[in-house]
């Protein structure tokens, strides 16, 4: 190849390589931002989720559901070692939150008490944008945060047995809707259910227990009051009985929006140290005070 041809070829290569560089140097207008980044848990088309036409400005009111006294089936024969055995448990009547505690209501608590704001370490702050709309369940709260909120409301966290009865009913079903593990009935792992992250509370009509309590199976795992007891048969519903010297872990119930697995059931149990905070963990409150309707004092 002669010198002249080489020079022409080199000039063509430099011209082609220089196009994108010159665009940057001249301040070429960048492409429009991905609209998905501006959306916060916007639902996809899914018949199991509520219509996206619901006003995002309408705040979901805190509401308590009364769970009547009596027996229910706790545990299961089909589950893991910490879910067995299946047994009959008798509870007194109590009230429990219909929905997981939302960002709106938790931030009211923060503003009025000066309590720590919910949120991840700064390196994960970008992720928080998907979790912060008013009607989404509050995330990044420790057991201590959840306990403080419920006490501020004049309530407490539910016990394991109270949580399970409220989410399951009394007939031993394995999911809030029955005994069929069908997909898209709750906000679990993946976006096929209609949400990339958490959904506004109560978005899945089928993730509703026989008592009318929402999101027990999906959306967020939830702190309960008990210290974790590996052998479920040894659970003592006297809330003072399970102490930190029995392992130092608090119990988590339910599944979350990142949970996968065909073996997920409403009876599943997990645990974590009480000062742990994560985007998959939230909570709800309960009370055994039966002298008045707690809904009368909720905003």
Indicate residue ranges for each PLM-predicted region.
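A short glycine-rich, aromatic-capped structural motif
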Residues: 57-121, 141-144, 218
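Disulfide-stabilized, aromatic/cysteine-rich ligand-recognition loop
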Residues: 2-12, 16-39, 49, 137, ...
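Short coil/loop residues immediately preceding or within conserved phosphate-binding loops
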Residues: 62, 86, 91, 133, ...
